[in-house]
Amino acid sequence: MSSMKIAIAGASGRMGRMLIEAVLAAPDATLVGALDRTGSPQLGQDAGAFLGKQTGVALTDDIERVCAEADYLIDFTLPEGTLVHLDAALRHDVKLVIGTTGFSEPQKAQLRAAGEKIALVFSANMSVGVNVTMKLLEFAAKQFAQGYDIEIIEAHHRHKVDAPSGTALMMGETIAAATGRSLDDCAVYGRHGVTGERDPSTIGFSAIRGGDIVGDHTVLFAGIGERIEITHKSASRVSYAQGALRAARFLAGRDAGFFDMQDVLGLR
């Protein structure tokens, strides 16, 4: 297999640096581009400087040049930036791996439409463990559809800007679909004041922000006389980076299509 020519968006961020480290360590991948935001003080620096390595790839804000050199773009940034990168990927026929969270439904529709022209994987969480957890939740939701209240509790570091997390929403969507519902019709986001008794048909969400928590997610099925908790905890972003590389490998040889990590892992 020829080496995958990969570019990283958000290259100076926490996740971007983890992705660069993973690409540099992968025997089947070559780092050919590192995107950063316009005005970043890191522009022009070597993408491997934080590792004490010289990669020969400088951080740039020139998306057109990066897409002209790359076959794959891995993007864990913000929705608005990802959509700009998506347009460039469409122009240059670059495969996309998107781990960005916080998209609106119209923005998600843009991603799905792009899958008709290029190959892309979009997932709110690239971790293999999280995606196996989704299958467990699908099974559990069907067993506990009656008589159990469902709550999703997530915790992340103080710098995370969206809530609930994309992973928590993905969990909610999985549970809702498994029980024949739409999450839009049954989600309750936080509670305050006199809320009245809990509606048993709802799925509740609670978000915690603090410290350097990488990502903890617990789904609680609370019945009478028992509680079942399914929990996934991320100790580092390594699992996300390795999952993103696995997604890129999955796209090799595919010209178009909209996929997620369930497709990548063969869990459908």
Swiss-Prot record:
Biological process (GO), any one: lysine biosynthetic process via diaminopimelate
Gene3D superfamilies: Dihydrodipicolinate Reductase, domain 2, NAD(P)-binding Rossmann-like Domain
Principal EC category: oxidoreductase
Binding positions (NADP(+)): R37
Keyword annotations of the record: Amino-acid biosynthesis, Cytoplasm, Diaminopimelate biosynthesis, Lysine biosynthesis, NAD, NADP, Oxidoreductase
Associated pathway: Amino-acid biosynthesis; L-lysine biosynthesis via DAP pathway; (S)-tetrahydrodipicolinate from L-aspartate: step 4/4
InterPro entries reported in the protein's UniProt record: DapB_C (IPR022663), DapB_N (IPR000846), DapB_N_CS (IPR022664), DHDPR_bac (IPR023940), NAD(P)-bd_dom_sf (IPR036291)
Enzyme Commission number: 1.17.1.8
One Pfam family matching this protein: DapB_C
Residues given in the record as (S)-2,3,4,5-tetrahydrodipicolinate binding sites: H157, G166, T167
Residues of the active site: H156 (proton donor/acceptor), K160 (proton donor)
Binding-site list for NAD(+): G10, A11, S12, G13, R14, M15, D36, G99, T100, T101, S123, A124, N125, M126
GO MF terms, alphabetically ordered: 4-hydroxy-tetrahydrodipicolinate reductase; NAD binding; NADP binding; oxidoreductase activity, acting on CH or CH2 groups, NAD or NADP as acceptor
Catalytic activity of the protein: (S)-2,3,4,5-tetrahydrodipicolinate + NAD(+) + H2O = (2S,4S)-4-hydroxy-2,3,4,5-tetrahydrodipicolinate + NADH + H(+); (S)-2,3,4,5-tetrahydrodipicolinate + NADP(+) + H2O = (2S,4S)-4-hydroxy-2,3,4,5-tetrahydrodipicolinate + NADPH + H(+)
Signal peptide: none
Localization per record: Cytoplasm
A GO term from the CC aspect: cytosol
Domain of life according to the entry: Bacteria
SUPFAM superfamilies hit by this protein: Glyceraldehyde-3-phosphate dehydrogenase-like, C-terminal domain, NAD(P)-binding Rossmann-fold domains
Family: Belongs to the DapB family.
Role of this protein: Catalyzes the conversion of 4-hydroxy-tetrahydrodipicolinate (HTPA) to tetrahydrodipicolinate.
Name of this protein: 4-hydroxy-tetrahydrodipicolinate reductase
Organism the protein comes from: Burkholderia thailandensis (strain ATCC 700388 / DSM 13276 / CCUG 48851 / CIP 106301 / E264)
